[in-house]
Amino acid sequence: KIERKKMSLWGRVGVLIFLIVVLIFAFIPYIGIGLDSFGRGWALTPIPVKYTLQYFERVSIETPKFIINSLLYSGISVFICIIVGVPVAWVMARTKVPGRDLLDSLTTLILALPGTGIGIAYMRAFRDPLPFMNTALLGMWIVIPIVLGVRRLPYTVRGTFASLLIVHKSFEEAAESVGAPKMKTFKDVTLPLIWKGVLVGSLYSFILALQEASATLLLVVPGHEMMTVGIFNFYIGGSVNEAAALGFILIILGTVCLFAISKLAGTKMGGVFG
Protein backbone atom coordinates (compact mmCIF):
# COMPACT_ATOMS: atom_id res chain seq x y z
CA LYS A 1 0.00 0.00 0.00
CA ILE A 2 1.30 3.43 -1.00
CA GLU A 3 1.19 5.98 1.77
CA ARG A 4 1.69 9.71 1.44
CA LYS A 5 4.22 11.22 3.78
CA LYS A 6 4.01 14.84 4.77
CA MET A 7 7.11 16.78 3.78
CA SER A 8 8.78 19.24 6.07
CA LEU A 9 8.54 22.95 5.38
CA TRP A 10 12.10 23.12 4.01
CA GLY A 11 11.41 20.07 1.87
CA ARG A 12 8.37 21.72 0.29
CA VAL A 13 10.32 24.93 -0.27
CA GLY A 14 13.16 23.00 -1.90
CA VAL A 15 10.80 21.13 -4.23
CA LEU A 16 9.03 24.37 -5.15
CA ILE A 17 12.32 26.11 -5.97
CA PHE A 18 13.46 23.13 -8.04
CA LEU A 19 10.22 23.08 -10.05
CA ILE A 20 10.38 26.83 -10.64
CA VAL A 21 13.95 26.54 -11.94
CA VAL A 22 12.99 23.65 -14.23
CA LEU A 23 9.99 25.56 -15.59
CA ILE A 24 12.09 28.67 -16.20
CA PHE A 25 14.62 26.67 -18.23
CA ALA A 26 11.80 24.91 -20.08
CA PHE A 27 10.14 28.20 -21.08
CA ILE A 28 13.32 30.14 -21.94
CA PRO A 29 13.20 29.06 -25.64
CA TYR A 30 9.56 30.13 -25.95
CA ILE A 31 10.26 33.46 -24.25
CA GLY A 32 13.23 34.02 -26.54
CA ILE A 33 11.16 33.28 -29.65
CA GLY A 34 8.44 35.64 -28.46
CA LEU A 35 10.89 38.48 -27.76
CA ASP A 36 12.66 38.02 -31.09
CA SER A 37 9.41 37.90 -33.03
CA PHE A 38 7.95 41.07 -31.46
CA GLY A 39 11.06 43.00 -30.41
CA ARG A 40 12.45 45.76 -32.61
CA GLY A 41 14.72 47.96 -30.53
CA TRP A 42 17.35 46.48 -28.22
CA ALA A 43 19.34 49.06 -26.22
CA LEU A 44 21.71 46.66 -24.46
CA THR A 45 18.76 45.43 -22.40
CA PRO A 46 17.53 41.88 -21.75
CA ILE A 47 14.14 42.76 -23.25
CA PRO A 48 13.29 44.97 -26.24
CA VAL A 49 12.54 48.66 -25.75
CA LYS A 50 10.33 48.75 -28.86
CA TYR A 51 7.88 46.23 -30.25
CA THR A 52 6.52 45.68 -33.73
CA LEU A 53 4.39 43.36 -35.86
CA GLN A 54 6.41 43.92 -39.04
CA TYR A 55 8.07 40.51 -38.86
CA PHE A 56 4.68 38.80 -38.75
CA GLU A 57 3.53 40.97 -41.66
CA ARG A 58 6.49 39.85 -43.73
CA VAL A 59 6.07 36.12 -43.11
CA SER A 60 2.29 36.22 -43.51
CA ILE A 61 1.99 38.69 -46.41
CA GLU A 62 5.28 38.59 -48.33
CA THR A 63 5.98 34.88 -47.87
CA PRO A 64 2.63 33.24 -46.98
CA LYS A 65 3.57 30.06 -48.86
CA PHE A 66 5.30 28.63 -45.79
CA ILE A 67 2.10 28.80 -43.72
CA ILE A 68 -0.21 27.76 -46.56
CA ASN A 69 1.98 24.81 -47.57
CA SER A 70 2.29 23.62 -43.97
CA LEU A 71 -1.46 23.63 -43.38
CA LEU A 72 -2.20 22.08 -46.78
CA TYR A 73 0.41 19.31 -46.68
CA SER A 74 -0.25 18.48 -43.03
CA GLY A 75 -3.97 18.27 -43.81
CA ILE A 76 -3.34 15.93 -46.75
CA SER A 77 -1.04 13.80 -44.58
CA VAL A 78 -3.79 13.50 -41.94
CA PHE A 79 -6.21 12.40 -44.67
CA ILE A 80 -3.69 9.71 -45.66
CA CYS A 81 -3.33 8.69 -42.00
CA ILE A 82 -7.11 8.29 -41.64
CA ILE A 83 -7.59 6.40 -44.92
CA VAL A 84 -4.78 3.97 -44.06
CA GLY A 85 -4.75 4.03 -40.26
CA VAL A 86 -8.42 3.38 -39.50
CA PRO A 87 -8.60 0.13 -41.55
CA VAL A 88 -5.27 -1.00 -40.07
CA ALA A 89 -6.55 -0.38 -36.53
CA TRP A 90 -9.80 -2.21 -37.33
CA VAL A 91 -7.89 -5.25 -38.62
CA MET A 92 -5.75 -5.27 -35.47
CA ALA A 93 -8.69 -4.89 -33.06
CA ARG A 94 -11.55 -6.76 -34.74
CA THR A 95 -10.07 -9.61 -36.78
CA LYS A 96 -7.95 -12.67 -36.19
CA VAL A 97 -6.26 -12.69 -39.58
CA PRO A 98 -2.73 -14.11 -39.63
CA GLY A 99 -0.07 -11.44 -39.51
CA ARG A 100 -2.01 -8.81 -37.58
CA ASP A 101 0.62 -8.86 -34.83
CA LEU A 102 3.28 -8.28 -37.48
CA LEU A 103 1.18 -5.41 -38.84
CA ASP A 104 1.07 -3.93 -35.35
CA SER A 105 4.85 -4.23 -35.01
CA LEU A 106 5.53 -2.69 -38.42
CA THR A 107 3.22 0.23 -37.69
CA THR A 108 4.90 0.90 -34.36
CA LEU A 109 8.38 0.48 -35.89
CA ILE A 110 7.82 3.66 -37.90
CA LEU A 111 8.30 5.63 -34.67
CA ALA A 112 11.81 4.19 -34.31
CA LEU A 113 12.91 5.33 -37.77
CA PRO A 114 14.62 8.75 -37.87
CA GLY A 115 13.21 11.35 -40.23
CA THR A 116 16.51 11.70 -42.06
CA GLY A 117 16.57 7.95 -42.66
CA ILE A 118 13.06 7.97 -44.11
CA GLY A 119 13.93 11.02 -46.21
CA ILE A 120 17.01 9.33 -47.69
CA ALA A 121 15.00 6.14 -48.31
CA TYR A 122 12.37 8.11 -50.25
CA MET A 123 15.08 9.91 -52.21
CA ARG A 124 16.57 6.61 -53.35
CA ALA A 125 13.23 4.88 -53.93
CA PHE A 126 11.55 7.60 -56.01
CA ARG A 127 14.44 9.30 -57.81
CA ASP A 128 13.63 7.53 -61.10
CA PRO A 129 10.56 8.33 -63.24
CA LEU A 130 7.46 6.30 -62.43
CA PRO A 131 6.35 3.71 -65.04
CA PHE A 132 3.18 5.61 -65.95
CA MET A 133 4.69 9.12 -65.72
CA ASN A 134 7.58 11.01 -67.27
CA THR A 135 8.70 12.53 -64.00
CA ALA A 136 10.02 11.14 -60.73
CA LEU A 137 7.90 11.35 -57.61
CA LEU A 138 10.91 12.91 -55.89
CA GLY A 139 10.47 16.09 -57.90
CA MET A 140 6.76 16.46 -57.14
CA TRP A 141 5.17 18.23 -54.17
CA ILE A 142 2.96 15.24 -53.33
CA VAL A 143 5.99 13.37 -51.93
CA ILE A 144 5.97 15.74 -48.91
CA PRO A 145 2.46 14.90 -47.59
CA ILE A 146 3.09 11.22 -48.37
CA VAL A 147 6.20 11.06 -46.20
CA LEU A 148 4.46 13.13 -43.50
CA GLY A 149 1.54 10.70 -43.54
CA VAL A 150 3.85 7.70 -43.23
CA ARG A 151 5.82 9.32 -40.40
CA ARG A 152 2.71 10.11 -38.33
CA LEU A 153 0.58 7.06 -39.17
CA PRO A 154 1.18 5.31 -35.79
CA TYR A 155 -0.59 8.08 -33.86
CA THR A 156 -3.79 7.74 -35.88
CA VAL A 157 -3.60 3.95 -35.66
CA ARG A 158 -3.12 4.02 -31.89
CA GLY A 159 -5.92 6.52 -31.31
CA THR A 160 -8.34 4.47 -33.40
CA PHE A 161 -7.19 1.15 -31.92
CA ALA A 162 -7.72 2.40 -28.35
CA SER A 163 -11.24 3.58 -29.24
CA LEU A 164 -12.10 0.24 -30.85
CA LEU A 165 -11.04 -1.62 -27.71
CA ILE A 166 -13.47 0.48 -25.67
CA VAL A 167 -16.42 -0.26 -27.98
CA HIS A 168 -17.77 -3.76 -27.27
CA LYS A 169 -18.14 -6.13 -30.20
CA SER A 170 -21.74 -6.84 -29.24
CA PHE A 171 -22.84 -3.55 -30.84
CA GLU A 172 -21.46 -4.65 -34.20
CA GLU A 173 -22.70 -8.23 -33.79
CA ALA A 174 -26.23 -6.97 -33.10
CA ALA A 175 -26.23 -4.97 -36.34
CA GLU A 176 -24.81 -7.87 -38.35
CA SER A 177 -27.35 -10.28 -36.86
CA VAL A 178 -30.18 -8.36 -38.56
CA GLY A 179 -28.44 -8.49 -41.94
CA ALA A 180 -26.34 -5.32 -41.99
CA PRO A 181 -23.14 -5.74 -44.05
CA LYS A 182 -19.81 -5.08 -42.35
CA MET A 183 -19.18 -1.78 -44.15
CA LYS A 184 -22.62 -0.44 -43.20
CA THR A 185 -22.13 -1.66 -39.63
CA PHE A 186 -18.81 0.15 -39.42
CA LYS A 187 -20.22 3.35 -40.93
CA ASP A 188 -23.48 3.47 -38.93
CA VAL A 189 -22.50 1.79 -35.65
CA THR A 190 -18.75 1.71 -35.05
CA LEU A 191 -17.61 5.00 -36.55
CA PRO A 192 -20.03 7.20 -34.53
CA LEU A 193 -18.66 5.57 -31.36
CA ILE A 194 -14.95 5.92 -32.19
CA TRP A 195 -14.81 9.22 -34.08
CA LYS A 196 -13.37 11.11 -31.11
CA GLY A 197 -10.45 8.69 -30.85
CA VAL A 198 -9.85 8.92 -34.60
CA LEU A 199 -9.93 12.72 -34.44
CA VAL A 200 -7.60 12.92 -31.43
CA GLY A 201 -5.07 10.64 -33.13
CA SER A 202 -5.40 12.64 -36.34
CA LEU A 203 -4.81 15.93 -34.52
CA TYR A 204 -1.68 14.47 -32.96
CA SER A 205 -0.54 13.52 -36.45
CA PHE A 206 -1.37 17.03 -37.69
CA ILE A 207 0.65 18.73 -34.93
CA LEU A 208 3.70 16.57 -35.54
CA ALA A 209 3.39 16.95 -39.32
CA LEU A 210 3.43 20.74 -38.90
CA GLN A 211 6.64 20.46 -36.87
CA GLU A 212 8.39 17.96 -39.14
CA ALA A 213 11.80 19.21 -40.23
CA SER A 214 14.23 16.36 -40.88
CA ALA A 215 12.48 14.56 -43.75
CA THR A 216 11.06 17.71 -45.36
CA LEU A 217 14.48 19.38 -45.48
CA LEU A 218 15.72 16.49 -47.61
CA LEU A 219 12.63 16.18 -49.83
CA VAL A 220 11.72 19.85 -50.20
CA VAL A 221 10.64 20.97 -53.66
CA PRO A 222 11.39 24.62 -54.59
CA GLY A 223 8.26 26.71 -54.10
CA HIS A 224 6.65 24.12 -51.82
CA GLU A 225 8.57 24.72 -48.58
CA MET A 226 6.85 24.26 -45.22
CA MET A 227 7.18 26.43 -42.12
CA THR A 228 10.08 24.47 -40.65
CA VAL A 229 12.03 24.89 -43.89
CA GLY A 230 11.04 28.57 -43.96
CA ILE A 231 12.41 29.03 -40.43
CA PHE A 232 15.68 27.44 -41.53
CA ASN A 233 15.88 29.59 -44.68
CA PHE A 234 15.18 32.81 -42.77
CA TYR A 235 17.75 31.94 -40.12
CA ILE A 236 20.62 31.09 -42.47
CA GLY A 237 19.72 34.20 -44.48
CA GLY A 238 20.27 36.38 -41.42
CA SER A 239 16.57 37.18 -40.88
CA VAL A 240 16.44 35.93 -37.30
CA ASN A 241 13.36 37.96 -36.36
CA GLU A 242 11.35 36.59 -39.29
CA ALA A 243 12.43 33.07 -38.35
CA ALA A 244 11.27 33.71 -34.78
CA ALA A 245 7.92 35.09 -36.01
CA LEU A 246 7.34 32.00 -38.12
CA GLY A 247 8.30 29.83 -35.15
CA PHE A 248 5.87 31.74 -32.93
CA ILE A 249 3.05 31.10 -35.41
CA LEU A 250 3.98 27.41 -35.37
CA ILE A 251 3.80 27.38 -31.57
CA ILE A 252 0.34 29.01 -31.65
CA LEU A 253 -0.95 26.46 -34.17
CA GLY A 254 0.35 23.59 -32.04
CA THR A 255 -1.21 25.08 -28.90
CA VAL A 256 -4.60 25.43 -30.60
CA CYS A 257 -4.46 21.79 -31.72
CA LEU A 258 -3.52 20.63 -28.21
CA PHE A 259 -6.41 22.64 -26.78
CA ALA A 260 -8.78 20.97 -29.26
CA ILE A 261 -7.42 17.54 -28.30
CA SER A 262 -7.90 18.25 -24.59
CA LYS A 263 -11.51 19.29 -25.21
CA LEU A 264 -12.24 16.19 -27.29
CA ALA A 265 -10.54 13.91 -24.77
CA GLY A 266 -12.39 15.58 -21.90
CA THR A 267 -9.26 16.28 -19.90
CA LYS A 268 -6.89 19.11 -19.07
CA MET A 269 -4.19 19.92 -21.60
CA GLY A 270 -1.50 18.32 -19.46
CA GLY A 271 -3.60 15.17 -19.13
CA VAL A 272 -3.51 14.67 -22.89
CA PHE A 273 -0.05 13.11 -22.46
CA GLY A 274 -1.24 10.60 -19.89
Q: PLM features: residue spans?
A:
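Membrane-embedded alpha-helices of multi-pass transport/permease systems
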Residues: I28-I31, L35-F38, I83-V88, I120, ...
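Interhelical loop and adjacent transmembrane-helix boundary motif
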Residues: K6-G11, S37-L44, K50-K65, L210, ...
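Transmembrane alpha-helix signature in integral membrane proteins
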Residues: I61-R94, G99
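C-terminal transmembrane helix and the adjacent membrane-cytosol boundary/short C-terminal tail
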Residues: K1-K6, W90-V91, G99, F161-E172, ...
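Loop-to-helix entry region at the N-terminal start of transmembrane alpha-helices
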Residues: V15, I20, E62-S74, A112, ...
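Membrane-interfacial helix termini and adjacent extracytoplasmic/periplasmic loops
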Residues: K1-M7, R40, L44-L53, I61, ...
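Cytoplasmic-entry segments and transmembrane alpha-helices of multi-pass inner-membrane transporters
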Residues: S8-L16, P87-Y122
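Transmembrane alpha-helices
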Residues: I17-Y30, L102, L109, V150, ...
